[in-house]
Amino acid sequence: MSPDREAVGVLIVDDQAPFRRAAKMVMAATPGFEVIGEAETGERAVELFEELAPGLVLMDINLGPGINGIEATRRITAAHPDATVLLLSTYQAADLPSGADTCGAAGYVNKEEFGPAVVLDLWKKRHDGASSSS
């Protein structure tokens, strides 16, 4: 990453500590991104989004008690339409729960396929086209 560009702050949301650790390792290996926060619940994800203003949210669909990742994404993107939220789960894309395609998420990735290349590809698709005028 060039010194003149700030890292994109990442919020990791998952109720399973082992996956949060794995996601932190993936993001550490992804140039241009830095984990700035973690949440175990959908409610805490919404709160932390407001506090930290991350550039990217990695959101598990199935969270413990309270609101799930789809509802948390809906709340974040309703208040911040430019937010970039990537839904993560063990579901196959064809088996995603109702609302996953309309909650405002930038995309969906199966946890088994999650890695630096996937994050970079999503980021480029979402942001390079929107910021190409200079």
Task: Name these PLM-found stretches.
Residues E47, I67-P81:
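Short amphipathic alpha-helix used as the core "switch/output" element in two-component signaling
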Residues G55, N62-G64:
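The short loop immediately C-terminal to the conserved phospho-acceptor aspartate in CheY-like receiver
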Residues A100-G107:
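As written
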Residues A7-P18, A23-M27:
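Conserved acidic segment of CheY-like receiver
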Residues M1-G9, A117-S134:
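Non-catalytic signal-transmission and effector/linker regions of two-component phosphorelay proteins
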Residues D14, D60-I61, S89:
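Active-site residues of response regulator receiver
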Residues E38-L56:
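Acidic, metal-coordinating helix/loop segments flanking the phosphotransfer/catalytic sites
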